[in-house]
A protein has these predicted regions:
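Loop/turn elements at helix/coil->beta-strand transitions in domains of secreted/extracellular proteins
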Residues: 55-57, 80-85, 105-109, 145-148, ...
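Conserved, mostly hydrophobic/aromatic
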Residues: 63, 77, 86, 110-113, ...
């Protein structure tokens, strides 16, 4: 069954990766370094080549990376000339900064998925903001710019989360369908689930830290192409004016 982000938050709890990452003992207070021109240029998402108001589009999104299987996923996306959106965890970007740069360089979109993958509504205001702002700074150092999109871990959100995101210039992105790939752990079933959830203007939630998901993507891309879909980033799918700071997409 398609799980929609406008449903009760209880549904969202099963949609994201299993465990929160442990915070290090101290948060970094270092200011963001100035990005080189090359890094800043590589961080710009590819311009939309299609008008999703006129053609059939879908956005594949991947949470919780970068991880050990992200490079293979990027190889597959490049081979099939498909774009995707990656919601990255700040702590993991620090561990795999080159992968984050590659995601940006190859024209995919990058979003903020918090620093340590905690449920944001459960945090006091300062810690909630720190989870997002620290990741903004990590990504600024890694790819030369701060993202404009965020996705709350587990899909847990409320008015405080949206307000904090808005103050940091971030729009919230949820989904129209989740594969529950982290629990399925089966290549065929994950692929079948994506294809069942696919619909025009859909936003599909997956995880590039799940190896079976990465293995499923070649078949998914081939089948979606056969169905006439353009594989685009969330921003290309949303179009102008729908991803303002503090906004939530899809509605």
């Amino acid at each position: 069954m398609v799980k929609r982000p406008v449903a009760a938050l209880a549904l969202a709890a099963v949609a994201s990766a299993p465990a929160a990452l442990a915070l290090p003992a101290q948060a970094s207070a270092a200011p963001a370094a100035s990005a080189s021109p090359a890094a800043a240029a590589s961080a710009k998402p590819a311009a939309a080549r299609v008008d999703c108001a006129k053609v059939k589009c879908i956005a594949l999104t991947f949470d919780d990376g970068p991880g050990p299987y992200t490079a293979r996923l990027l190889d597959t996306l490049k081979k099939h000339k498909a774009k995707a959106t990656f919601f990255l965890v700040g702590k993991r970007v620090e561990e795999r900064r080159k992968l984050a740069r590659r995601i940006a360089r190859e024209g995919h979109e990058i979003g903020n998925h918090s620093y340590s993958h905690q449920s944001l509504p459960a945090l006091p205001d300062f810690e909630l903001t720190e989870e997002l702002s620290r990741t903004q700074d990590v990504l600024r150092r890694a790819i030369g710019r701060r993202p404009r999109l965020m996705r709350p871990p587990y899909g847990h959100t409320d008015a405080r989360v949206r307000a904090a995101a808005g103050r940091l210039g971030l729009a919230q992105v949820l989904w129209t369908g989740t594969t529950l790939d982290w629990s399925l752990r089966d290549t065929r079933r994950i692929g079948d689930t994506v294809l069942r959830l696919a619909r025009p203007n859909g936003v599909i939630l997956m995880h590039d830290v799940v190896p079976q998901t990465v293995k499923a993507i070649p078949r998914v891309l081939r089948e979606l192409r056969k169905r006439g879909y353009h594989l685009v980033t969330v921003s290309a799918l949303a179009g102008p004016g729908r991803l303002a700071p503090g906004a939530s997409f899809p509605r």
